[in-house]
């Protein structure tokens, strides 16, 4: 059976990033969903400038379709075709790798033509046909641990990728269900998943979600993003995933748990300090 890579390199040239438990933290960041070309470029420009000033590797993320909205009326995004055009333009302009989530087998090949990292949503982390189709694109995979899975259960998830010929997999912690409308983050999961051999990413913003907690939409407690992110980075992770928006309270999705764009410099400075200590 193919071994997973403990050091995953993504992108090319000056924008290339490395995910490794032993190397400097890499950031995955961007708005929850792609709202427009103009909005994507605005957020990306701010993040690129910030990450350059900090010497921090950046993967830009955004979703073309929020397929698991709480309500049928929830806004879902601009769609696959338009989003791929925007992602291609973003890569040409800024040089960074990009990440987006996929929901069906049919989307894998189309998205992989442009996107560097295919993300498997937590709710779909056991869907074998989707995982195999994603693996066969050859792109790096970021698979979110299902809220219903133990960290050691990710061994079987990881094997679906490696046995399909893809060793470039990131395992992402995003909280575990704890009763109704509540998630908790068990920091033990980070070293447990790292012991499986793949780099581990901590999703600091979805971990503070309150699923369905607002009745027709998901709630969240963004005031705890920094607390959990600092804890995870202190334990030791290859990357941290943070959704951000210039006006989270008026964002079309996941506003309650997104970090205001203006607060990102302070957050990242603190996380890099913790990362330096954890990996000293």
From Swiss-Prot:
GO molecular function, one term: 3-deoxy-8-phosphooctulonate synthase activity
Pathway terms, separated by semicolons: Carbohydrate biosynthesis; 3-deoxy-D-manno-octulosonate biosynthesis; 3-deoxy-D-manno-octulosonate from D-ribulose 5-phosphate: step 2/3; Bacterial outer membrane biogenesis; lipopolysaccharide biosynthesis
InterPro entries reported for this sequence: Aldolase_TIM, DAHP1/KDSA, KDO8P_synthase
Catalytic activity line of the entry: D-arabinose 5-phosphate + phosphoenolpyruvate + H2O = 3-deoxy-alpha-D-manno-2-octulosonate-8-phosphate + phosphate
Enzyme Commission (EC) number: 2.5.1.55
Subcellular location: Cytoplasm
Keywords linked to the UniProt accession: Cytoplasm, Lipopolysaccharide biosynthesis, Transferase
Chief location of this protein within or outside the cell: cytoplasm
Keyword field contains Transferase: yes
GO biological process: keto-3-deoxy-D-manno-octulosonic acid biosynthetic process
Listed name of the protein: 2-dehydro-3-deoxyphosphooctonate aldolase
Gene source species: Rhizobium meliloti (strain 1021)
Gene: kdsA
């Amino acid at each position: 059976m193919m071994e997973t890579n403990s050091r995953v390199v993504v992108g090319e040239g000056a924008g290339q990033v490395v995910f490794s438990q032993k190397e400097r933290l890499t950031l995955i960041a961007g708005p929850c969903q792609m709202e427009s070309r103009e909005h994507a470029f605005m957020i990306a420009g701010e993040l690129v400038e910030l990450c350059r000033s900090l010497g921090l590797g950046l993967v830009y993320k955004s979703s073309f379709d929020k397929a698991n909205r709480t309500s049928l009326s929830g806004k879902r995004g601009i769609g696959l075709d338009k989003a791929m055009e925007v992602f291609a333009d973003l890569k040409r302009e800024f040089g960074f790798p990009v990440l987006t989530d996929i929901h069906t087998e049919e989307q894998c090949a189309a998205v992989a033509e442009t996107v560097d990292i295919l993300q498997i949503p937590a709710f779909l982390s056991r869907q074998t046909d989707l995982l195999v189709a994603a693996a066969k694109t050859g792109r790096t995979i970021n698979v979110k641990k299902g809220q219903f899975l133990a960290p050691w259960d990710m061994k079987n998830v990881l094997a679906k990728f490696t046995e399909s010929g893809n060793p470039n997999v990131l395992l992402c912690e995003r909280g575990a269900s704890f009763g109704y409308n509540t998630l908790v983050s068990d920091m033990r999961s980070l070293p447990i998943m790292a012991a499986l051999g793949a780099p581990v990413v901590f999703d600091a913003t979805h971990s503070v979600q309150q699923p369905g907690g607002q009745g027709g939409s998901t709630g969240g407690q963004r005031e705890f993003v920094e607390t959990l992110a600092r804890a995870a980075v202190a334990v030791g992770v290859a990357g941290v995933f943070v959704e951000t928006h210039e006006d989270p309270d008026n964002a079309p999705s996941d506003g309650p748990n997104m970090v205001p764009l203006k607060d990102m410099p302070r957050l990242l400075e603190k996380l890099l300090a913790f990362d330096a200590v954890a990996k000293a």
